[in-house]
């Protein structure tokens, strides 16, 4: 009887562990600047998200980027990002805030986030407002 209980407890423990390992957590992908440029050329439906402050954005940003400051993400709904499954490509000045923002977006339920660092490494066109 003790052997049977031991076997059942062991089986239950392994089943519980197997169930936990099947739980998938969403995360963002980090890509290089070159990969981002390639992705922008190949994809059709994506958003380029600049998470710097509005004054930094006005000084120069990647063409067609929208600005939602990192400090705002997580404090309220983001009307500029209504589709939580859409590809969102995130950048900032150096890469620190874009990583923070990407983590926050994932926690908010966004499922297709790529982070590609900072505009300091951007070699393409920059537009000002």
Briefly describe each language-model feature range.
Residues 4-6, 17-39, 46, 55-87, ...:
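Rhodanese-like catalytic fold shared by cysteine-dependent sulfurtransferases
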Residues 48-50:
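Hydrophobic beta-strand scaffold positions of dinucleotide-using enzymes
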């Amino acid at each position: 009887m003790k052997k049977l209980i031991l076997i059942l407890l062991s089986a239950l423990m392994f089943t519980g562990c197997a169930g936990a390992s099947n739980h998938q957590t969403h995360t963002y992908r980090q890509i290089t600047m070159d990969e981002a440029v390639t992705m922008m050329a190949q994809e059709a439906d994506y958003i380029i998200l600049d998470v710097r402050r509005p004054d930094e954005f006005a000084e120069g940003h990647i063409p067609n980027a929208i600005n939602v400051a990192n400090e705002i993400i997580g404090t309220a709904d983001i009307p500029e990002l209504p589709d939580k499954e859409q590809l969102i490509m995130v950048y900032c000045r150096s890469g620190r805030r874009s990583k923070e923002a990407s983590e926050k977006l994932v926690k908010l339920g966004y499922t297709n986030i790529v982070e590609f660092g900072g505009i300091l490494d951007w070699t393409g066109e920059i537009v000002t407002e």
